[in-house]
Curated annotation (Swiss-Prot):
Coiled coil: none
Keywords for this protein: Cytokine, Disulfide bond, Early protein, Glycoprotein, Secreted, Signal
Positions of disulphide bridges: C90-C140, C95-C142
One matching Pfam family: IL17
GO cellular component: extracellular space
Record's subcellular location: Secreted
Family recorded in the similarity comment: Belongs to the IL-17 family.
The keyword Glycoprotein belongs to this UniProt entry's keyword annotation: yes
Gene of this entry: 13
Glycan attachment residues as annotated in the record: N36, N53, N64
Protein name per UniProt: Viral interleukin-17
Amino acid sequence: MTFRKTSLVLLLLLSIDCIVKSEITSAQTPRCLAANNSFPRSVMVTLSIRNWNTSSKRASDYYNRSTSPWTLYRNEDQDRYPSVIWEAKCRYLGCVNADGNVDYHMNSVPIQQEILVVRKGHNPCPNSFRLEKMLVTVGCTCVTPIVHNVD
């Protein structure tokens, strides 16, 4: 799914959450909200993104060509949007040199990015959603190791 579609869905869900919290009375349990007859079935969200038509075409094999290659793993959770997030795991502790051999004089380290996801609620409020931060490993990079000299 594209960034644009993901952003639109996240904004839609956040808008619904705000409307629900501001216009709905409490249900049987104090933590859950119940819909009344004026509860909106849909919400229109206007999203303004700069450089809307900019397309970024990149090679899809960075994970193999990098001096710090990684493998992508599917992280799937049906109670989260997006339900599938691809995460990287560094293949080696060291880095690949020009000859294609692993050099342990350098370190392969993960690159992490914090993203926002929407999580579906469960008992006692199954029809609720909450926004959460998630730390995702998006790739790996090669760095010089930190060396501590013992005097």
